[in-house]
Amino acid sequence: MGIAVIAGSLILAFAWTAGLFGHQTTSKTFLGDTLKNFDPGYRRAHGKGICFDGTYHSNGAAAALSKATVFAKSDIPAIGRFSIGSGNPHAADNSTATVSMALLLSPADHSQWRMKLNNFPYFPTRNAEGFLAQQKAFKPVPSTGKPDPALVEAFLKEYPEARKSIEQKAKMPLTGSFSGAEFYVVNAFILRAANGQQQPVRWSMRPHSKFISLTKEQRDQADHDFLFKDIKKCLAEGPLYWDLVLQLAELGDPVNDPSQPWPKDRKEVIAGILEVKNVTDQVNGACRDINFDPTLVPPGIELSDDPVLAARAAIYSQSYNARLREIGFGKATDAVGK
């Protein structure tokens, strides 16, 4: 299956999981249906979000691993976005357990490092085709409102790694605040040092704030926009901080399989601290017009041969271009609180 086909199908899958498509959608019309069904001006996934700005304080600890200037000791402007996992920009914050961070770092040499992180440390399947198969297998049957058990079992037989993901997500604590969430990059990247040496890495944003866990009952009763109201309240009291933690792969660790976490005892390097200072509504915030395509990396950081990573560039491009057209016609609106 070609990357372009996978990319288009993934956009469709994101939309389907958000409940935005009817049963008449076909492979020929999915892009047109996408543009019609998504609220104009919103991102095609993680439609509900809020912009933030701050500073990334690089401590120089990773400079020996990569020639990228983002790892030299310096203070770098940061623009980012917090969001929830639903594709619906008007969704309640308790409608999904997924919370996310997107980030753009812009060092003085005019290079850029863009990244997208979620609060789950690995991808459900080993490739993009598996993700599509998962969406099909778990699509509710009209007569029961539940997935067909036979299709689910067939999917899990072909993609057994997904069972681990499903079980872990069922046990994952429900976060009550962006401020204490740890965010992970599930794909591997390659750091290239000035001498040419290469080091595969994944990374996370590890919070300084305490993780706030909610019971299911607390989350079910929470305010429609509780996460976004909370982040505003937290920042009114002062900046929030996350460590950028690089996890270094060793020989034999799966670099091209985002469904397989690396052993927890792998060496870690704290490359710097992200300081988040302010948030602004996404309708007019600095993050609105940014494409947080994680394949846009500076010299010194390279893409691995992870097939999911390869598919993501086209996904982000299609979503971004459609969104900019809509914004250009004045159709962008603010989701939070509406």
Label for each model-derived stretch:
Residues M1-K338:
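Active-site-adjacent core segments of small-molecule enzymes
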